[in-house]
Swiss-Prot record:
Protein's gene: deoB
Protein name: Phosphopentomutase
EC number: 5.4.2.7
Residues at which Mn(2+) 1 binds: D10, D346, H347
Cell location: Cytoplasm
Residues that hold Mn(2+) 2 according to the record: D305, H310, H358
Domain of life where this protein originates: Bacteria
An example molecular function term from Gene Ontology annotations: magnesium ion binding
Alphabetical list of SUPFAM superfamilies matching this protein: Alkaline phosphatase-like (SSF53649), DeoB insert domain-like (SSF143856)
Reported function: Isomerase that catalyzes the conversion of deoxy-ribose 1-phosphate (dRib-1-P) and ribose 1-phosphate (Rib-1-P) to deoxy-ribose 5-phosphate (dRib-5-P) and ribose 5-phosphate (Rib-5-P), respectively.
Amino acid sequence: MARAFLLVLDSFGVGGAPDAERYGDLGANTLGHIAEFCAAGAADRAGLRAGPLKLPNMCSLGLLEIARQASGDIPAGMEPPERIFGLHGSASEISKGKDTPSGHWEIAGTPVTFDWGYFPTEGDAFSPELVEAICRQADIPGILGNCHASGTEIIAALGEEHIRSGKPICYTSSDSVFQIAAHETHFGLDRLIALCETVRKLLDPLNIGRVIARPFIGETVATFERTGNRRDFSVPPPEPTLLDRLVEAGRKVHAIGKIGDIYAHQGVTRVIKANGNAALMDATLHAIDEAENGDLVFTNFVDFDMLYGHRRDVAGYAAALEAFDARIPEIHRKMAPGDIALLTADHGCDPTWRGTDHTRERVPIMAFGPGIRSRDVGIRSSYADIGESIAHHLGIEAGSHGRSFI
């Protein structure tokens, strides 16, 4: 039996990107800075966590050596393992963006070598012509926001006005994205999804990567809270990905969390929705039980990025990493001979960095399973090597990008 389990710790970068300066991210290091804050006691939070960052299972998969290779530094305060199991290394990104689709598509063997469209103006981000077209086609009275913003902050600032006026909150960031926040009951979840579908069509000519529905509940600024009904409306990848090649070869792709949305549901045979890292891990373990020979189980663990990276919450990010690490043995116990599990990330989002955006970083590669020997695979020149390694392991034809390290 040969199966593959690909787990993306969304935004868990390890620093060291050779082109970080071009993105204003020279020195950004998600793992390194979290560990530094933890070692200094700056990520202690009563009832949540305290002390140095404790990731014993990932360290046994080579995380400290990965960090040393990628950025030149061993994370502060972390305990080295007695020995390293499995394949370990890191990868640089060749895609031009530092966003979720770019990272995931490159992981699956399709780097984004073209330029995304963006909304670079921080105020009045969307043109009057675009706003007018959205309002007319979606039959809405107008929009709120129209700026670069943090999602939680703009909901706090405009949520009550949104409820009163019926106008959705529209905003963007340095990524190629158009985000729409609306109340699940006052505006309606189905109406929000329909609005996003309308906006998606209008933005296709502008080459905007994603339209994201951001539903929330609550009646006042003190009670507003995002729900788990987020939806991403992505443009499809520009060429077949690992997922497409697997499906064409008669294999199944179990897409957990937002994986289906990221690939515009291309190359996906089964979509499994779950909300929160714990539920995503539960869903992953259940999918492993059901996966057949040749299948791929593919999960995005979004909380690292959405709840802690963008919100610059170091303690929250550290606690989430420790909780994830504690469950890695559950994956080990589910694995059969011939299986491989691979942990990686799609970009960085250093919670100690300025602003609220992603950071350009290398990502870790930690691969393990029965029969997988410990080996340093070095610094890979593209995330695409990850997808090609899975393709090789599952015995399908190689793609056009990347090189297997298996």
